[in-house]
Amino acid sequence: MRTKAPRTSSPKSAPLQARSPRTPAANGSTNGSTNGHAKTNGHAKSNGAAAPAKRGASAAKTTSKSAAKSSSTQKPTTAKANSALRKASRGSLLTHETAHLFKAGAITTDSPIIYVNGRMVPKSQAMVSVYDHGLLYGDGVFEGIRIYNGQIFKCGQHMERLWRCAEMIRLRIPVSRDEMVQIMHDCVAANNIRDGYIRLVVTRGFGTLGLDPRKCPVAGVICIADQIALYSPEQYEKGMKIIVAKRPRTPIECLDPRLKSLNYLNNILAKVEAIDQGCDEAIMLNLDGFVGECTGDNLFIIQGGRVYTPPTESGILEGITRRFVMDLCADMGIPCLLKNMRPEEVKTADEVFLTGSAAEIIAVTQIDEIKIGSGLEGPVTRRLRQAFKAIVQGREIPQD
């Protein structure tokens, strides 16, 4: 019988009261916007506290007309993207500058089109202020989300986690959940993506030098829809080699592992350890020496036909793909249990695999110098990976 990790409620602390900057003109912004979420005519409000982006008739209208049809020299995929971009322009997300670049065909070499604080802009114009606290201090939260068959995988759960994480750091997201979902759909359509990846970022926003979050009037919102390939096709077929990092996970008492924040330095330094040893991933242990997770993926082992994964109390992120795979095990009649594990137990497992939004399911065939099982992707891992693929390649993608 599968057991679930206990869930704790998110803190309901009110967002911190923001103070408007006294000198908004000297904002250091690299895109001319004082706070993000500027009106969609491309001109930021002078008080540095513009309203959140809105769609349709309620949004500020662009003065430019819809761009002309794509020329016959453009590739079909580009023509489709242009059509989607015209649709976005009717929703007042395009700036004047972007509309002109769009007409000139610049987006054919300057993709993806990215949502930045109320505007859809080419990659070269997707900029934030150098005074944004997300850049200065890693103050913000994010989500990585998969797109399958043009649909957003587990959209509801990702939105729930994003808002929960924002509440944990007392950050007010300046758009509603429905508006955020629409932003994602607009980015997917503008870039003509059928299968890809969405990166949603919410920063504390433009502020001043210094940690005080009250100096940031409005949070920043960025949405990128693009392709992603963390690992090679060969690694998915043959499995990957990983290490056990010497650097432990940040203790739960210092930073709640459920918080998907912009500060990933602990993970990055463990990743550097792996790279130095010719590997792409590393297992991170908690201070008690138990296995937590990898730098960007959750970890599972298979022993005696049973699947095990560390509980959230071991200091891991509650991965959405992790939860989906646990439910998939139950549907397939494979026992899946939560268990604290030492690295030695993982190294002697029959099979090991990792899960993540970007990684999906990938086998681990070697840890440090120890071969896992036969040294090939194991039969249970293969069954789960194939079942996962069958679901996400189907017509109806799980969205809640």
Language-model-detected regions and their locations in the chain:
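Secondary-structure junction motif
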Residues: T321-R322
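Glycine- and Gly-Pro-enriched alpha-helical subdomains that act as flexible
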Residues: I283-N286, F290-T312
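Conserved alpha/beta cores of soluble small-molecule-handling proteins
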Residues: R2-K12, R19-R22, N27, N31, ...
